[in-house]
Amino acid sequence: MKIYTLHAKQNLPISREQAWQFLSDPKNLKVITPDYMGFNIQAGADRTMYAGQIIEYIVTPILGIKNRWVTEITHVVDQEYFVDEQRFGPYALWHHKHFIKEIEGGVEMEDLLHYKLPFGYLGQLAHPFLVKPKLEEIFEYRKNKLVELFGSM
């Protein structure tokens, strides 16, 4: 079974502190997720991010099918990076690293996502036509939303 990778970088004209304050609040995930995803946090977003935090969502990632998604924040280094891992949800594996690096005039935000699909060979067949384009669309939406909120470099 194949493990896929999605890698994205974005520069924003804000401080590392501002970027961290926004990203470390789980409630802001709804802000940067397309409305059609039906994203709603069910539990676990009442505090800023910490290692061991469990966050439960309802999300409609593909074909209008509602999914319960549970992630754990497994690693946090204040104002540098955090990792979220799916504990229950639509993927066989979901390991998402978020990095923040100070650069001249702002920050570089980097996402490194490793994921595996369920359903073996059928999942692999669906990847290039359904899953990969949807994930790329979601990450592009996030990129545009962050520019709308914070400006561009």
Feature annotation, model-predicted:
Residues T5-H7, K66-V70, L93-H96:
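Short, surface-exposed coil-to-beta transition loops
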Residues S15-R16, T74-Y81, F99-E108:
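A short, structured loop/turn motif at beta-sheet edges
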Residues I41-F88, Y141-N144, E148-M153:
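Glycine-rich portal/gate segments that line the openings of hydrophobic small-molecule binding cavities
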Residues H7-P13, N40, I58, E72, ...:
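Generic structural detector for well-ordered beta-strands
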Residues L12-I14, P61-L63, H75, P90, ...:
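Beta-strand elements of well-folded, non-transmembrane domains
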Residues M1-Y50:
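Hydrophobic ligand-binding cavity/cleft-lining segments
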Residues Q86-E137:
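Beta-strand/loop substructures that line and gate deep hydrophobic ligand-binding cavities in soluble
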